[in-house]
Amino acid sequence: MQAHWTGQNCLVLVDKGEELLSALKQFAEENQVASAFFYGVGAVDRIKVGVYNESLGNYIYTEYRMHMEISSLTGNIFLHEGRPFVHAHGLFSSSGMSLGGHIAECEISRVCEIHLTKLADIKVSRKGALPLPRLSVG
């Protein structure tokens, strides 16, 4: 992974074979990122995406093992119990089909190019139990 900062903005390049959420969590820890939003594009070989089921109180996940483009990646990083918590959603496409949802795992196949913006003047954290801790501002 590579990171190139300019002010509160960073170009993050996640490399082939890296797991996206783990890489972003490590990046946040190493760069003291406590509050940020990000978006990006790239390609993957494997994803595990889901949707939150309100009645069950958890996510229902499906795993896909195929080469897909990241048509859209968006998310945020906020602290939960003092550690970076990455929350990401994605839209993935391959051979005329698209799928997406809440990202649980995402293995990069070539590169993932992310624009991340730190929120310098707003203190945001996550409070509550996993899998869906709520945002708390202030």
Positions of predicted regions on the chain:
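N-terminal intrinsically disordered, cationic/polar leader segments
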Residues: 1-86, 91-138
